[in-house]
Amino acid sequence: MDGILTIEGFDTSLAEGLMLLTPFAADAQDEKTQAFVSAYKEAYGDTPNQFAADAYDVVYAIYQAAVAGGINGDMDASDICDALKAQFTSMTFDGLTGDSMTWDASGAVSKAPKAVVIKDGAYAAM
């Protein structure tokens, strides 16, 4: 349901009071989230949703894994993949969408969801 409020022509009153779990709440008061939301609004004129925060996190998670894995321009694609897999299955990552995120060998991420409610046509942290 995250993103439903931005569907063109959607009557947001239909979702009023809807509760959902999401990895990201744009109105969370921590400094990291507020800095991201502010920069996103300035760049795109809209409030970011879960998918924007996920994209932001994945760039920095890959960067962290690449640095820790010693990835460089002399490596071939197979070596890069092996290094990334090794790092992702052994590291933790603190991002906008979760603290202490981990990944298993299949690539599935483990992170705690946040509860939000749709109130007055916007997502609100619970």
Predicted regions mapped to residue ranges:
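Extracytosolic ligand-binding ectodomains
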Residues: 1-126
